Amino acid sequence: MERIWNYNRQIKLVILLRNPSDRAFAHWNMQRFKDREPFDFLTALKEEPRRIAQPLTIESRRFAYVDRGFYSRQLERVFKFFPREQVHVVKFENFRDRKQETLDGIFEFLGVKSLPRVRDKDRNVVPYERTIGPEERKYLSEVFSAEIAKLEQMLGWDCSDWKM
């Protein structure tokens, strides 16, 4: 963030946040699809602290399924350099479900002309091996409970849909 701030202190940032449990599961699925992840999802989650404790490398970050979902730490780093007026945080689920409305809000924030209609096409779609199981969902719900509450406070959001 400091390098961006040094480059352009007036820059406007748009940040997209996804339900951290869904993000973790999608991340794991991508690693499985690329044959980089030997563990089942729950084992991978429980092994994560050991795996990412290595010196920071791209390889170790590949397995940061949970760690990357602690958005408040990342946002605090952003807000250390940029005032909130320069940062527009978007909930991924709003973008997915109300794409044009969400994009119009982003365009307005950026001060640019809105596009009449944006083509709706998903990118980087990887077929999921399976859906997330109830035990895994419960585990992640407990892991992210305090984080989600902190985000609700920090952003003034209702994240009840992230608590399931």
Region roles according to the model:
Residues M1-F39, T57-E101, A146, Q153-L155:
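PAPS-dependent sulfotransferase catalytic domain
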Residues Q10, S72-K150, W157-M164:
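The conserved 3'-phosphoadenosine-5'-phosphosulfate
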Residues H27, A44-E47, Y139-V143, M154:
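Residues that form generic nucleotide/phosphate-binding pockets
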Residues E37-R51:
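Core domains of carbohydrate- and sulfate-ester-processing enzymes
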Residues A53-D67, V125-E136:
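Surface-exposed cleft-lining segments at the edges of enzyme active sites
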